[in-house]
UniProtKB/Swiss-Prot annotation:
Keyword Cell membrane set for record: yes
Protein name per its UniProtKB record: Ribose import ATP-binding protein RbsA
Entry keywords, A to Z: ATP-binding, Cell membrane, Membrane, Nucleotide-binding, Repeat, Sugar transport, Translocase, Transport
Species name: Oceanobacillus iheyensis (strain DSM 14371 / CIP 107618 / JCM 11309 / KCTC 3954 / HTE831)
Binding locations of ATP: 35-42
Subunit structure: The complex is composed of an ATP-binding protein (RbsA), two transmembrane proteins (RbsC) and a solute-binding protein (RbsB).
Source taxonomy: Bacteria, Bacillati, Bacillota, Bacilli, Bacillales
Length: 496
């Protein structure tokens, strides 16, 4: 299928979202679509797949002008859209999720479960992925859920697959396998739209790139004819001096110390510390135990043994409330499920963790809350006209700032950040990095879990690498390289 979208306009009320966008897709190509959150990428793809119509412009598919009535019609035509927000029903099994709305039945209306399993196994084998079909999808990791979504698209036998941040929660091995599958699909004539903020992936896998900014298509280029700095300038409309802001940290005394921390089946004998003003990067492959260690420190999960000291005093943490009272804060990797209530306003979300500060004998002091939220909005440069705006209406970068504001407001001594810039555009990432620098300059200690190796190297003062639930290596900023981190992450000796 060949697609040509010309002069696409879309507005919602008085808000012009797309203003004359051009985009094309050739059979067998991988075309990257990049832009800051809010640039209009998803809106453009929603118009292509029939979620809503354009106000102006044309879509031509294989030479025929086309406008799908809905996403079901576009799916039947061979267009699959794997969205960033996973379409997984947690209470249903893996098999049920794969076939929801597309169940295979016999002439009596009974499910042909054996045939369904065979088809699912065929797709899973292509993904080199194994998981029990009767397992509840909600029990799967985020990475496993992403692969289920990809499997659903492959089962449609689609001619065009749109992928929105498909690798965000995948391990390096899973990403490599996905890229193999993508190349195999293009050889069969399938065209792929690849929406991502990961520049290294785009240069590794894509043929062309279209950059969008503020509802317009800035430029379409062949990957071989462009570079990182050019794309960043097109995305943000300005030069970014450096990808990561300069750090000139001043370290104080150890704030948090963890000793002999163990939980059977998850991690063993974890021992580390983090100092005032320091960013401790935590690296490792997916499933190594990085998040599990931090969840246990914050009191979400129990441990078998170990001790936690804050400012030299032993803590007893039985649940997150104890952790918060002690001076810990935890920004989880899944901000939309665990960090935010999307239907609530910015004010309500930021206030959730700070109710004690605004209440008097059970009554919330509204003015104090509003003043505090306004301060956080200005301090973190959250782009909004009102603090009453539902958080779900914000871009990914601004949603992440709301999560940070929510926890910074508790005045923590230690801030744990799990994948702090996942799914955030390059401009918003730099703002988050600058904020992290400001927080450490005030003496806050930050523990940053990240699967983005350039981010780990660019922002960490010290790097702790986890392999199979144990600390396999530790590196200071000056000696750290991607190769050394990956050696430790895969169980090797960094000194070999």
């Amino acid at each position: 299928m060949k697609i040509v979208m010309e002069n696409i306009h879309k507005s919602f009320g008085s808000n012009n979202v797309l203003e004359g966008v051009d985009f094309s897709l050739e059979p067998g190509e991988i075309h990257a679509l990049m832009g800051e959150n809010g640039a209009g990428k998803s809106t453009l793809m929603n118009i292509l797949t029939g979620l809503f119509p354009s106000n102006q412009g044309s879509i031509t598919i294989d030479g025929v002008k086309t406008q799908y009535k809905d996403s079901k019609e576009s799916e039947q035509a061979g267009i699959a859209f794997i969205r960033q927000e996973l379409n997984i029903l947690p209470q249903m099994t893996v098999l049920e999720n794969l076939f929801i709305g597309k169940e295979m039945t016999n002439s009596f209306g009974f499910l042909r479960e054996k045939v369904m399993k065979e088809k699912a196994e065929e797709v899973f084998s292509r993904l080199d992925f194994s998981i029990p079909f009767d397992k509840e999808a909600g029990e799967c990791s985020v990475g496993e859920q992403q692969l289920i979504e990809i499997a659903k698209a492959l089962m449609l036998d689609a001619k065009i697959i749109i992928m929105d941040e498909p690798t965000a929660a995948l391990t390096d091995r899973e990403i490599d396998k996905l890229f193999e599958i993508m190349k195999e699909l293009t050889q069969q004539g399938v065209a792929l739209v690849y929406i991502s903020h990961r520049m290294e992936e785009i240069f590794a896998i894509c043929d062309r790139i279209t950059v969008m900014r503020d509802g317009i298509s800035v430029k379409t280029s062949w990957i071989k004819d462009t570079n990182y700095n050019e794309i960043v300038k097109q995305m943000v409309g300005r030069e970014l001096d450096e990808r990561y802001p300069e750090r000139t940290p001043t370290f104080g005394k150890p704030v948090l110390q963890v000793n002999n921390f163990s939980r059977k089946g998850y991690f063993n004998d974890i021992k580390f510390s983090v100092r005032e003003g320091e960013i401790l990067g935590v690296s490792g492959l997916m499933g190594a135990g990085r998040t599990e260690i931090m969840r246990a420190i914050f009191g979400i999960d129990e441990v078998d043994q170990g001790e936690i000291l804050l400012d030299g005093k032993k803590l007893t943490i039985k649940d997150p409330t104890d952790a918060m009272k002690a001076g810990l804060a935890f920004i989880t990797e899944n901000r939309k499920d665990e960090g935010l209530v999307l239907d609530f306003s910015i004010r309500e979300n930021i206030g959730l963790s700070n109710l004690n500060s605004f209440s008097n004998k059970g009554f919330i002091k509204g003015k104090d809350e509003k003043d505090f939220v306004e301060l956080m909005i200005k301090r973190l440069q959250i782009k909004t006209q009102t603090q009453e705006l539902p958080v779900g209406n914000l871009s990914g970068g601004n949603q992440q700032k709301v999560v940070i504001a929510k926890w910074v407001g508790t005045s923590p001594r230690v801030l744990i950040m799990d994948e702090p810039t996942r799914g955030i555009d390059v401009g918003a990432k730099r703002e988050i990095y600058q904020l992290m620098n400001e927080l450490t300059e005030r003496g806050l200690a930050i523990i940053m879990i990240s699967s983005d190796l350039p981010e780990v190297l660019g922002m960490s003062d010290r790097i702790m690498v986890i392999h199979e639930g144990e600390i396999s290596g530790e590196l200071v900023r000056e000696e750290a390289t991607q190769e050394k981190i990956m050696t430790y992450a895969t169980g090797g000796n960094g000194h070999e």
